[in-house]
């Protein structure tokens, strides 16, 4: 079976790829992350993934839409519930790409993060699968998160400190500084 793996970053993807390949899936990576800002962050994550994909012979499809304006427009009406829009942006596009590319299924490296809302992501991915009539391959990759971070450090990957959106970055700094917005 061939599956399209939506990839948020190389540190999260490395163990997902290993697990899927270990389960005999033919994996193709898919880069689409209009939520990642600023542009320097977007570029750092994308370039790290490109280099890693080349070293492990991972086919990689890139949709390089730096989407600051569409992303902010989509989430600005309800900042507190922005994650659902972010998941929809990426998982619906992954499902569409999987269907159009003739893949048997799709999944995402987002499912490795203990910091993401797993049930919400799963629900969004299932809706995307139904809309595009393609299988959503669910895997709970969270048990591999620490090993993936270790491997990323060993390989010298760029490792980010926030999910990618500017609101997440703001939260990270506000927690450290104890400043109230």
What is the role of each PLM region?
Residues 1-181:
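Nucleotide-activated chemistry modules centered on ATP-dependent adenylation/adenylyltransferase
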């Amino acid at each position: 079976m061939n599956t399209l793996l939506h990839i948020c970053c190389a540190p999260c993807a490395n163990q997902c790829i290993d697990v899927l390949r270990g389960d005999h899936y033919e994996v193709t990576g898919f880069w689409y992350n209009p939520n990642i800002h600023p542009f320097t962050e977007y570029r750092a994550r994308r370039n790290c993934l490109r280099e890693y994909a080349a070293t492990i012979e991972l086919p990689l499809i890139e949709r390089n839409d730096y989407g600051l304006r569409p992303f902010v427009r989509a989430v600005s009406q309800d900042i507190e519930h922005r994650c659902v829009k972010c998941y929809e942006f990426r998982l619906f596009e992954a499902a569409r790409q999987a269907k159009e590319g003739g893949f048997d299924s799709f999944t995402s490296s987002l499912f490795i993060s203990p910091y993401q809302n797993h049930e919400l992501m799963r629900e969004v991915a299932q809706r995307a699968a139904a809309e595009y009539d393609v299988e959503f391959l669910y895997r709970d990759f969270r048990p591999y998160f620490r090993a993936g971070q270790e491997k990323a450090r060993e390989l010298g990957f760029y490792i980010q400190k926030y999910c990618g959106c500017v609101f997440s970055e703001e939260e990270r700094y506000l927690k450290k500084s104890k400043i109230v917005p």
